[in-house]
């Protein structure tokens, strides 16, 4: 077989839908849009969530809560998940083991499961139950500072610039 003989399998490519080209095509006259009305006209359609002028659901329901832009999203790891690891357990080791993705603001270890081997766990946050389980197994916990957010970096730079004057 050569390049000039390559062909898509039957049914892989759908024929182009040619509308408004006579009654015989099945898509003539109104071109598959039905009769008159807003949806038959050219131009923009109404927006998603539009209910024909009726007060839409997203405006009928009350607003509540707020979104904290400074919130830290931590990746969670249970103590039982650390069982297969050895030595020093840090975010890089957890990522290589496939326990975290490494695209959040840090790692938190939660209580859950048993731990039999002594580990040195270096994470951003640890719950009291998880700390007790790690220390009971003969390990130790070291907290590492959370990576700075862009807001914190800007604030620190501004403070340093003010002190330099």
From Swiss-Prot:
Coiled coil: none annotated. One of its GO terms (biological process) is translation. Pfam families: Ribosomal_L27A. GO terms for cellular component: cytosolic large ribosomal subunit. The keyword RNA-binding applies. NCBIfam families: rplO_bact. This is Large ribosomal subunit protein uL15. Residues 1-44 are annotated as: Disordered.
């Amino acid at each position: 077989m050569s390049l000039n003989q390559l062909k898509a399998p039957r049914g892989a490519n759908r024929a182009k839908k040619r509308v408004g080209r006579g009654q015989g095509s099945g898509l003539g006259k109104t071109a598959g849009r039905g009769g008159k009305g807003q949806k038959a006209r050219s131009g923009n359609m109404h927006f998603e969530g539009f209910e024909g002028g009726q007060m839409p659901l997203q405006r009928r329901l009350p607003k509540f809560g707020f979104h904290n832009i400074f919130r830290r999203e931590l990746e969670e790891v249970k103590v039982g998940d650390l069982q297969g690891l050895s030595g020093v357990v840090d975010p890089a080791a957890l990522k290589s083991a496939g326990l975290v993705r490494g695209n959040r603001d840090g790692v938190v270890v939660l209580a859950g499961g048993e731990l039999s081997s002594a580990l040195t766990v270096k994470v951003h946050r640890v719950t009291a139950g998880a700390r007790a389980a790690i220390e009971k197994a003969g390990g130790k916990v070291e907290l590492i500072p959370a990576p700075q957010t862009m807001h914190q970096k800007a604030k620190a730079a501004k403070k340093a610039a003010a002190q330099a004057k």
